[in-house]
Amino acid sequence: MKIKFNSPLVLGFVFLSLAAMILNIVTAGASNHLVFMTYRSSLADPLTYVRLFGHVLGHAGWQHYIGNMSYILLLGPMLEEKYGAKRLLGVIALTAVITGLINFFFFPGVAICGASGVVFAFILMTSFTGFKKGEIPITFILVAIVYLGQQVYDGLFVKDNISNMAHIVGGIVGAVSGYLMRKK
């Protein structure tokens, strides 16, 4: 029996995020602020555009990293096998850019980092894996209610350091992507 490097996109994402995490520790947070965190900054700064994508690779600490990567490693390989690396990379990039832009324009005093939006996109996409034309899986409805409902509740009533917006937007991107890619 041999070890197989399955799911190159997902594993690449996990290892890039690990490198960003280690770099953040080595630089005492400077790399996250510079590249792996999105916040309102000058549109003339080229790193503003890098951060729109890069913020999904950065994490605030090991617990944040391990939590997100656990879900990505659990759900990602199945999604990569079903939809292909190119399409899944598109979902990751779309989630990153949309959450980054929303944060940039609507939450000017807030900096976000982490792959939580990608995790929520994967969760909602996964519920479409058994989708048949003309049907909406009950699992999708339940997952949407449980995961997105919790984020809406937390966003309204719980004051913490978590970007519920990124979770909700990631979930929406995943749901729409799962629906649009279901038969392709």
Where do the model's predicted regions map?
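A detector for small-residue-rich transmembrane helices and their helix-helix packing motifs
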Residues: 1-184
